[in-house]
Amino acid sequence: MSKICIIAWIYGRVQGVGFRYTTQYEAKRLGLTGYAKNLDDGSVEVVACGEEGQVEKLMQWLKSGGPRSARVERVLSEPHHPSGELTDFRIR
């Protein structure tokens, strides 16, 4: 499989519920690099890079609601080309 990067925006009750940290754990478990960060509008932005199948697994996890404490209402995503190399999955 080829390597890909996506950027996703997750909306709903996704801040203050451990969403970024649980996403980081899941992404690292899948061998992905990238980041998760809170945005001012209450959403979370996630960039994930790695094997296509693993990125798709993370996207499915996000769309299925992420951590139990969160309530995901909507996930938008598109292909992404990061400006620099991502060597780990971080919280921003």
Swiss-Prot record:
Disulfide bonds join 5-49. It holds the Pfam family Acylphosphatase. GO terms for molecular function: acylphosphatase activity. SUPFAM superfamilies: Acylphosphatase/BLUF domain-like. It catalyses: an acyl phosphate + H2O = a carboxylate + phosphate + H(+). Keywords: Disulfide bond, Hydrolase. Its EC number is 3.6.1.7. Residues 5-92 form the Acylphosphatase-like domain. It comes from the Bacteria. The active site is at 20, 38. Belongs to the acylphosphatase family. NCBIfam families: PRK14426.1 (NF011000). This is Acylphosphatase. It comes from Shigella flexneri.
